[in-house]
């Protein structure tokens, strides 16, 4: 193995990615009522959602330290790639860059590139898989970086949540008009901007209609979908995720698709019942 891919823990690793030995996770952490929860293999989604529901305080998150990234860069490979949450939404990207600087000051010799996903969750997962795909066909380091950066440019992220409280209270919806959603059961269809911030794309009354609207946006925005993998992450709602996949695949043909349950950070922001789609 001559390369490593580091993905911060907002990006869910599929079973195949975990088994490959190529991927390593840079864990973020969460806090609910002073209780510290690492976003790693010990994360218990059911317990976490229960704690959040019982708390009057908004859960908080913190990103991996530069030193943690530096530790992950130290390995017996020639090329290291890191994939982080959008730099507009988290400090993880800047931590990864600073970790690279610290590592190289210690005479680290590996080639390192940090990808700003401008996304989250399965957006990061797909970028990690794209890196692996490029490496497996024999691209050199510079070709991998160029190809994956171009892939990120074409990627779109969408989500519909039961509530936006955690995103709003943690300042991730800055600049958006206040959304009156709960009283009228209005569900906004949210998406990513090219810069990696969050925008509102649409809205509908009720979750079912909002998910259908989201599927329409996915199909409309898709760039060369027959060459792409559709990824869906759900927070404790597998049937809803399958229904969304069916809705999208009725409208657009893709290379492949997969569904994962949200890990810690994605569970924190998506909340119980949330759906995230990336194509």
For each of these PLM feature ranges, what is it?
Residues 3-4, 10-24, 28-29, 89-92, ...:
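Mixed-charge interfacial surface used for oligomerization/domain docking
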Residues 84, 113-114:
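A glycine-rich beta-strand to alpha-helix segment
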Residues 3-63, 68:
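N-terminal glycine-rich anion-binding loop in soluble enzyme alpha/beta folds
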Residues 2-3, 77:
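Local beta-strand N-terminus motif with an aromatic residue
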Residues 33, 107-112:
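Repeat-mediated protein-protein interaction surfaces in helical alpha-solenoids
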Residues 64-80, 84-107:
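Active-site cofactor/cluster-binding pocket
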